[in-house]
């Protein structure tokens, strides 16, 4: 049974997509047009009752939330491709810790920047300059912590690439691209080296080329 991932073009979904590609798992995609409200249609709500993206369908099994999907893929296909979860319980703890940091500390200010700088103009809404300023300041503080961590380890959870690193790829691509604030990455030596490593991985290059930003 081939896995199916919904809405592969959007950043949140690409967390799941890059995990599938890293693991060498075959999958199909189904586009969901958020601008047309397809995520609120009954057939989509039947598999994602909150009307959000992404969703992974694996036969009769359905799972949503991008980081949960990443964990599911990494566990189910642990024996193939790179081990993205860590080899010991201590390494796994670090992977989980930095996945949570990405979700709770890194992603919120970056999402605010994405919405105000990239999507607000497309949707005809004024950007909130106060939110932009505050979000950039918050993200800079988070990245200072990353700089300290990455001065000790090659990757966030240790000296191995993991889900914690991959989870950062899609929205950081916005940060260094259409958001226009690459200096937040480049001005930090160790963060910059880390970003160069993870963004140059073959799996991410494939995902970026095949599933281009919807803006």
From Swiss-Prot:
The protein's Enzyme Commission number: 2.5.1.18
GO cellular component: apoplast; chloroplast; cytoplasm; cytosol; peroxisome; plant-type cell wall; plant-type vacuole; plasma membrane
Tissues where this protein is expressed: Expressed in roots, stems, floral buds, mature flowers and leaves.
Regulation: induction: By dehydration stress, wounding, H(2)O(2) and jasmonate, but not by growth regulators.
Keyword entries, A-Z: Cytoplasm, Detoxification, Stress response, Transferase
Localization annotation: Cytoplasm, Cytosol
Domain GST N-terminal intervals: 2-81
GO molecular function, one term: copper ion binding
Organism: Arabidopsis thaliana (Mouse-ear cress)
Function text: In vitro, possesses glutathione S-transferase activity toward 1-chloro-2,4-dinitrobenzene (CDNB) and benzyl isothiocyanate (BITC). May be involved in the conjugation of reduced glutathione to a wide number of exogenous and endogenous hydrophobic electrophiles and have a detoxification role against certain herbicides.
Domain GST C-terminal: 88-215
Coiled coil: none
Encoding gene per record: GSTF10
Disruption of the gene: reported phenotype: No visible phenotype, maybe due to the possible redundancy with GSTF9.
GO biological process, one term: toxin catabolic process
Disulfide bonds: none
Name of this chain's protein: Glutathione S-transferase F10
Family matches, as PANTHER family: GLUTATHIONE S-TRANSFERASE F10 (PTHR43900:SF50), GLUTATHIONE S-TRANSFERASE RHO (PTHR43900)
Enzyme class: transferase
PROSITE patterns membership: GST_CTER, GST_NTER
InterPro entries: Glutathione-S-Trfase_C-like, Glutathione-S-Trfase_C_sf, Glutathione_S-Trfase, Glutathione_S-Trfase_N, GST_C, GST_Phi_C, Thioredoxin-like_sf
Subunit annotation: Interacts with BAK1.
Catalytic activity: RX + glutathione = an S-substituted glutathione + a halide anion + H(+)
Alphabetical list of CDD domains matching this protein: GST_C_Phi, GST_N_Phi
């Amino acid at each position: 049974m081939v896995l199916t991932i919904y809405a592969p073009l959007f950043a949140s979904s690409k967390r799941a997509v890059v995990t599938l590609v890293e693991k060498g798992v075959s999958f199909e995609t189904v586009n969901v047009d958020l601008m047309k409200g397809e995520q609120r249609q009954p057939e989509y709500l039947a598999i994602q009752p909150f009307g959000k993206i992404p969703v992974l369908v694996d036969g009769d099994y359905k799972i949503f939330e991008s980081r949960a999907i990443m964990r599911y893929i990494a566990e189910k296909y642990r024996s193939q491709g790179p081990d993205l979860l860590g080899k010991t319980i201590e390494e796994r703890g670090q992977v989980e810790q930095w996945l949570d940091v990405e979700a709770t500390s890194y992603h919120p200010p970056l999402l605010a920047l994405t919405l105000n700088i990239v999507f607000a103009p497309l949707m005809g809404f004024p950007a909130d300059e106060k939110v932009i300023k505050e979000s950039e300041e918050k993200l800079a503080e988070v990245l200072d912590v990353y700089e300290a961590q990455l001065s000790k380890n090659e990757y966030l959870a240790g000296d191995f690439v993991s889900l914690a690193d991959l989870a950062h790829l899609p929205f950081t691509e916005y940060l260094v691209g259409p958001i226009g604030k690459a200096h937040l990455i480049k001005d930090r030596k160790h963060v910059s080296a880390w970003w160069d490593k993870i963004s140059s991985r073959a799996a991410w290059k494939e995902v970026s080329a095949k599933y281009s930003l919807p803006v």
